[in-house]
Structure formats: structure tokens, C-alpha cells
Amino acid sequence: MDVGPSSLPHLGLKLLLLLLLLPLRGQANTGCYGIPGMPGLPGAPGKDGYDGLPGPKGEPGIPAIPGIRGPKGQKGEPGLPGHPGKNGPMGPPGMPGVPGPMGIPGEPGEEGRYKQKFQSVFTVTRQTHQPPAPNSLIRFNAVLTNPQGDYDTSTGKFTCKVPGLYYFVYHASHTANLCVLLYRSGVKVVTFCGHTSKTNQVNSGGVLLRLQVGEEVWLAVNDYYDMVGIQGSDSVFSGFLLFPD
């Protein structure tokens, strides 16, 4: 009998069935087990079963040991520009810029009060037939102008109220020798003398002084004191502020 390769599975299956039937028959007749048959060939794999139910959650694993830090990577491409940040603190002042061109003239301002604030002027005369006493202060008793009241006729002294540069001048009539001395706060500044004998003559002098507030100026005579003040022969003392400080 010629057996090909394709009939081997069928032949093996038949032999297996024959071996299974032989013991059953021998047991029924004699009561003894037969010799076990040879194991059959493995069957074909069965179909996959259904998925089982999820198992319980496992225990946390052991933390892994940190690995060694790798080398620095290559520089990446520049990113997109970010949003503008908040304003920082003010920086230090910069260097002065180049002066700009001159602007057009502005409107005239209001008239100032310079003249009202800084004025000092007086003119007084000596109207008496009696000359001053020797080596004494000369009092001028008649006021021609004294709007600020800086000259006091009771004391014969000018008192500075506005600091600045002043000019003082006098014209004295006399018929005998006369020397006029100008004092500043007790210190003699200048002396003017005129000499005559029984004739009317005029002695004049002037001086510029820079005064501070509270300083005083007056005229005096020495041993030559023949100053008169009569109609037609006046003696005048004047002073005024030129430039305030």
C-alpha cells in the first residue's frame, strides 16, 4: 500500500482511535489494563479567549536612580520676539543738548514796580539867621521834598532804608570862613572849606556813598562855622538813591 505525505495525518488519527478502543475491549473480557498508547500529535491552537477583568492596581515602583546629566545640546534657533516688558526705572539725566534757535519776541510784560519799591530822595534847607554852633551837627529845618521820610529834621540825619549807591550834595551860603564835614555813621568822609571875608559866597560839595540799611549820613561844621540861610542866600542839603543793591 502506497502512503503519500498528504495521508499521514488521517492515518495517525485512525491509529489513535484504534488504540483507545483496544483497552476497553480487553478490560471487558479480562479486567486488565492495556498498555498506554503513544501520545497523540499536538492539536491546532485554539481561538483567543475574551479579555479578562482588569486586575487590581499594583504597588508603586521603586524610584529610579537619577541618571547622569547629558552634555549640553547645540544652540537652538532664535525664538519669536517676546511681548514688551514693563517700563524700567528712569535713567540718569542725559547731556545738555545743543541750544535751539532764538524764539520770536514775546508780548510786553506788565509794568514793574521798581520805581515804587526802590526810591529815596530828599532836599532840605536851613532857614535861619543864626549859624550852627562850632564843631556841631548842622540841622536843616525846612523840607522841600522828603517823600520817604528818610531825612529827619529833628536830628539833622539821613537814615538809609534801601541799600545801594547814593549821591549827597550841599550848597552853603556864608559871609566868613566855613568848613563843611560829611559824616557816615560817625566817621568823617570828606571836608569842604571856603574862605571869605565879609562877602557872600557859596561853598559846595558832593560825594557818592554805598550805604547799607540803617547807616546814617549828616553834615557838620568845625571851627569855621559861618553858614547862613536867608532869602537870597540859601543853604541846601540833598541826597538821592542812584542804584539799589
UniProtKB/Swiss-Prot annotation:
SMART domains associated with the record: C1Q (SM00110)
UniProt keyword list: Collagen, Complement pathway, Disease variant, Disulfide bond, Glycoprotein, Hydroxylation, Immunity, Innate immunity, Repeat, Secreted, Signal
Q: Residues bearing 5-hydroxylysine? A: 75
Q: Which cysteines are joined by disulfide bonds?
A: 179-193
Location(s), subcellular: Secreted; Cell surface
Query: The Collagen-like domain covers which part of the protein?
Result: 31-112
At the top level, the lineage of the source is: Eukaryota
Tell me what this protein is called.
Answer: Complement C1q subcomponent subunit C
What species is given as this protein's source?
Answer: Homo sapiens
Q: Gene for this protein?
A: C1QC
